Regions:
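Terminal leader/tail segments of proteins
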Residues: 1-105
Length: 105
């Protein structure tokens, strides 16, 4: 698991983890993992939860969480989904980094 950060020296590790879909953890409540299941739906609204359930059935391979809420995931077919729902400012900042998922190596 890569140790990452949303600022400073760990930012390079965060970008690497997101572009290569590698497990990572920050010192806070932001992490990603290779998985085919979901640990928690957190604060997802019904629309986002339904999308997540559909994608889990289709097959997922990587999920990014902020405060136990999935904020982005990558399906086995390579499709990246970033939730559209608004959250706190902190989770909003976390969501901002998920664009790197689409820059997969």
């Amino acid at each position: 698991m890569l140790r990452a950060s949303i600022r400073g020296a760990g930012l390079d590790n965060l970008r690497k983890a997101l572009t290569e879909h590698l497990d990572f953890k920050t010192s806070g409540s932001f992490w990603g993992e290779q998985t085919n299941s979901i640990e928690s739906v957190g604060w997802l609204n019904d629309t986002e939860r339904e999308r997540l359930e559909e994608d889990v059935k289709a097959g997922i391979k990587f999920v990014v969480y902020s405060y136990w809420t999935p904020i982005a995931w990558v399906r086995r077919d390579g499709e990246v989904y970033r939730v559209k729902q608004k959250f706190t400012n902190t989770t909003g900042r976390h969501k901002g980094f998920t664009h790197w998922l689409e820059e997969a190596a």
